[in-house]
Amino acid sequence: MLGTPQTQESENKPLIGDLGFGSNNLQPPDTISGILSIHPLGEPCHSVTPCSQDTIEDCALSSTPVANDTNSTCTESEIGLTDDDCNLEEKEAAARAKSDIGEADDSPFEVVRTAVSNSDNPAMPSMTFRSGVLGVFFVCLISFVNQFYWERDNPIALNLLIVQLLCYPLGVAMAWGLPRRMWNCFGYRWTMNPGPFTIKEHVLISLMSNASAYMALTVDIFAVLRLYYNPSFSLWTALVLLLSGQLFAYSLAGLSRTLLVLPASMIWPSSLINASLFRTFHEHQPEFDKSINRASISDSKVGLAVESSLWARDGKQGLGVLSFSLDWSVFSNAFLLSPIATPFWAACNLFVGFVLVFWIALPIAYFNNLWGAASLPLYSASVFTTNSTQYDISRVMRNGVFDAQAYEQYSPLRMSLEFSWVYGIGFAALMSILVHIALYNGKEIIARVRETKTKHDDIHGKLIMQYPSVKAWWYLVMLVASAAAGIAVGVGAHVGVPWWGYILSFAIAIVLIIPVGIIQAVSNRQPGLSLVAELLSGIVLQGIPTGYSILKLYGHGSLAQALSYAQDMKLAHYMKIPPRQVLLYQGIGIVISVVIQTCLFFWLVDHIPDMCRPEGYPWVCRSTNLVYSASIIWNLIGPLKVFGEGSPYSPLLWGFLFGLFLPIPVYFLQRRFPRCTWLKHVYIPVVLSGIVGLPPMPPVDFPMWFLFGFIFNFLIHRYWNTWWQKYNFTLSAGLDSGLALSGIFQFLALSQNGIEINWWGNQVDRQCPLSAQPWLTP
């Protein structure tokens, strides 16, 4: 059990950081079972001493969490409530009698038994004043920060890990400082402070916040409509469409919970890491290293994480050779995520793929003028004519749809060599992950699907059954209502997509949710979904550029969000959170985040000159411009013309075959040489996936990102492991948070007042300007 002292044998097992702990969720096979109950600051587990009446105030004031499980003996009368208000001790005794179980009654899977408790305390507070206030606070914070930075040159993203680390001290502070008296409101008795900050409150806050973590991706869809296709596209239309897409995704996740969440065989490995982290906060008593001043560490986090306008950095258009930067947003952003929280084996795979393609193959092909690419910029996400000018879509459109005759008279579409190669590598990555999953996880997936009947109700399923469930028809009503609202508003607002285009988008998500969800729940890997939606939209909605936006929103976006919500539901399942409370908190998080992010984007567009254009730096909207270019490639002109016969880019279709066969020799080599240490960490889908993100990510970010990963997760991990265990992940969270706060401060205090700080190294127009020019003159 996690609440007992660790033996010497258990301390030698792999650490969380070795298993892909962090936002990227990349874990090598057969190592997730090594998850230990290691404190995020690196401390091993210790037993927790129950607090007595004499020490209750010390428990509340202490930075060490009180164990909020069935081992706690603290009663409500001991924290300021009278015995007449309630007798928590009696409630907990009854709860223990109801939910105590034997060691043999546990999950059938060792990996789950290692990370998740097989007991529950139904009397533990979860839906409280504290969890509501902190949940709303972090939803607003994450929604604002992620959307604010998403359109900037180096976007950052606050995620679940940040919330887990930051909300804990706030929860402990509220448990210490809030009044503990009982209140009567409409016959309901409640208190602001039911006692020590509990693990269930912590989980609910994180689930509410995580509902908004990656919603900025879908806002790009409306950014393209607003900026390029329909300047009159209104805020209210965007709000309804985005809200309908998110609620459709959530209801789809809820309807699929019987197959993706409840079965014991659907493990969702990433949820195990989060569950283990929650338990380390609330079930252990870390002994901090007194030789390290935590206050000075905290100060340095914010001091170092200063935004790009103040630190030296490289230009953005080259390939990043010998690049150097002191800007933390280069090292940790929404494209690459924190190098400190990325396992070193994954960083090596990503960087090797980057070097092979961008530093070796791409320059050779470019300077040999492959496909006439030398007359275009080396790195660009824009689309061009054969004369190397920016592609003017108004020349090939009539009444909002594609005009084939005008296209023949104007120019075929051309892409930079780097941009076109990314599509070819994307084709290979899609096939390679399917083959990789079949080779490495195929038998496991088949076994887990068969076990959904025989191992449906493990101990976690039995314990969660004591709480009222969410009725399936609730989700069904939500799904139908959100889909109907999306169709009605989209057609009524003349977005340009026929009603059946919306139906097709919904059908894509409905058909793929179960098979893709099973793959992700078992293997912790999600097949590439974006290309599937792009291919279908280009085939069935060719000539309608706005069709790309709708299929990305409801087809790809809703499916990806539904899988994220399903993963969060599994985390709540493991942590024994009442399902109806999960529905309420996640629903509130979705609504708040949609309103904040959509309104913020429209405000930025109206108040920032030249937004999403090079002249508007740093508000260059890399991801938005990529979506715009993709809408031209896939829907306006169509894949048959761009990648079909007669096009210079037709050889890129060989990427499908290349990706199909590439993982096979690696698989057999790993079986042939099982003792080869480096070979067992080679993962072709990871090698290819790092390349697919360029663009929108600039190549200049990669070298410094890998350097910091090498320093922290190789050198420090190997030679200063005690420090690494204690401070590695909290340092990453502190740097990301400090960056977000400092950037907002600079925008409000400096940029909004017309103040610019210019010195050598931070002027983007003087950083290798030739890198943005073509090698050959057209």
Regions found by a protein language model. Give the residues of each.
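Alpha-helical multipass membrane-protein architecture
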Residues: L2-P778
